[in-house]
């Protein structure tokens, strides 16, 4: 529920089992809640707002002002949600519920131990947010991804850009030869 206080604090991007999180939880966790308030200006709302997650282990449900922004499954892949329509000028609440039952054999657990003490690995279990999270404000149209492909034989580089939104785009091609 929006505005509900949580029982503790955690340093993100460290999982609650990590000493650096300030929690250092040693038992199994089925899931963990995160909540943060952010202030957004009218000017920032003129474009798009994209909420990025470096990684959350394993299933993340993301809420903005009590509304579901999206869900993501997978503990190692980055993901993002366009939260523009869910934000308002002023204070906004972002909440994340991360679910990761390491004892469920249907959920990939990597090298995490199913036993209380680590067995077969030298690190703690990982539940929840364990990579950086950031809220990015962009124009309505923006380049979300750029990739470069090189061909050593031909000496060519191909660049592809992924554009989000509608905009007039001019493509320019340059050729540079080295002898």
Language-model region placement:
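Accessory beta-strand-rich segments of carbohydrate-active enzymes
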Residues: 25, 29-142, 166
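Short Pro/Gly-enriched beta-strand edge/turn motifs at strand-loop
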Residues: 18-20, 114
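Predominantly extracellular/luminal regions of secreted and cell-surface proteins
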Residues: 1-9
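Solvent-exposed edge beta-strands and adjacent loop segments
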Residues: 12-18
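Short beta-strand elements bearing conserved aromatic residues within extracellular beta-rich modules
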Residues: 60-62, 171-174
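Conserved small/polar residues in nucleotide/adenosyl-binding loops
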Residues: 175-179
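Surface beta-strand/loop "capping" patches
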Residues: 139-166
């Amino acid at each position: 529920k929006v505005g509900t206080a949580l029982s503790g604090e955690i340093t993100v991007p460290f999982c609650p089992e990590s000493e650096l999180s300030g929690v250092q939880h040693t038992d199994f966790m089925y899931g963990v809640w995160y909540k943060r308030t952010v202030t957004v200006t009218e000017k920032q709302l003129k474009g798009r707002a994209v909420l990025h997650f470096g990684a959350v282990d394993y299933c993340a449900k993301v809420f903005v002002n009590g509304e579901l922004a999206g869900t993501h499954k997978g503990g190692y892949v980055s993901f993002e949600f366009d939260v523009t329509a869910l934000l308002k000028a002023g204070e906004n609440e972002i909440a994340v519920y991360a679910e990761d039952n390491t004892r469920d054999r249907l959920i990939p657990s990597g090298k995490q131990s199913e036993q209380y003490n680590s067995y077969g690995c030298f690190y703690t279990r990982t539940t929840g947010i364990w990579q950086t999270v950031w809220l990015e404000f962009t124009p309505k149209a923006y380049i979300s991804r750029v990739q470069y492909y090189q061909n050593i034989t031909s000496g060519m580089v191909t660049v592809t850009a992924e554009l989000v939104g509608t905009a007039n785009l001019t493509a320019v091609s340059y050729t540079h030869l080295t002898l």
